[in-house]
Amino acid sequence: MTNTNIKKTKFLSFDGSVEIVSQHQRPDKFRDLEQIPKNVTRIGRGGGYSYTAPSFGKNILTQEMTSFNRILEFDEESRTVVVESGITLKELLKWSFEKKLFLKIQPGHPGITIGGCVASNVHGKNPHKDGTFVNVVLEIKLFHPDHGIKILSRTQNSDIFELTCGGFGLTGIILSVKLQLNVLPSDRMVFEKTSVQSLMDAVELFQNNLDADFISSWHDGSPSKKNFGKGVGYKGVFANSFKSSKLIMPKKEGITPFSRARLPFSVLNKTTAAVIYSFYRYCQITGPKTYERNIFDSLFPFGGNAKYYHLLYGKNGLSEYQILVDFKKVEEFIGDLIKLVKIEKPPLIIIFMKPFSGNQKYLRYSSSGVSMALNFQRSPITKKTLSKLDDILISYGAIINIIKGSSKQVVQTCFPEYYKFIEDLKKFDPRRIYKSDLSEKLGL
């Protein structure tokens, strides 16, 4: 390739687990995408905040789409907007806030791009109420060198639309997306904190507040009987009015995979985490039960001070294991999880939970139940524990969030449409031009 925009770059997954040097292009016009020879294996990339490596791989050209960040069309009556795939959630909110509109499904980091949201089919603050990102996607403009530009929607090329939403970028480069926006009720959210003594306490809290705008909990992962599962639940609703016409945003930019890894060692381990989170929980439950937070900090907790959480894992990073368990099976599953933690005593730092509702399709992290994100310090004991947790996960028919990491065997077993996804993808792209480290590891 003679394109001067292509260079060698070292890529790093956000959790620190995958590091690869490969070819890198930052196209700023469509012609840059078109001129790449058709035989070149490639993959699109957004902000680069995935815990795995769906946007880079060995001997694979990464096409970073962050220069494609314009707002192309807006229909005030229908509240729909067409944006280029490289626009970030932060940039979109900055624009939509002025119109008192917002995208109701948003993951926790403001630097994630819309293209990345589509490819990973992300979820937001209450997936039980709002579903996953596919629910706000109306239309996609996709480029594939063998097919040219294709318009995808639920009524046009619907099969490729379904493959692309939660398809990890394997159908081609997402050029633009038409999104459904919602009315923004306020510039603030009002939160209520609830002390929870166990994981099941949080499940009960969820079931009593499924219509909240925001619902989640965090729990101490310490293997000690005294602390495990204790935490705080949060219910949030929009305030009734606007206090300010200006969007309050942090002045400093968020962390990147490389800035996240600047500490040479992990501050968080079994001992320090138990002390830190016991103190933090004490402060949370003894302070005011209700509080207000501006809309930016409400939508993007990892865009504010909480971003430093990831820094505490140091250069070696963290291992996140995110699973979705059916409501009817969650109590028994939690019992087996507690037994495993007591036996193996892994450096399980914290557990985040929220309720889900939806239909599972292809490889999407979507179903009805409770989502649990288990954050471990990376270590040999963690690896051993996760191997045993895989067996428990499979026995309960739960699913795993692929974008947070998993093995081929687990993905094959957890997702009934694993082979259908591969078959349908090959029908559309027989030469399999779009690949990544993630797709290679999972046999996609």
Segments predicted by a language model, with ranges:
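Noncatalytic alpha-helical scaffold of FAD-dependent oxidoreductases
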Residues: 1-444
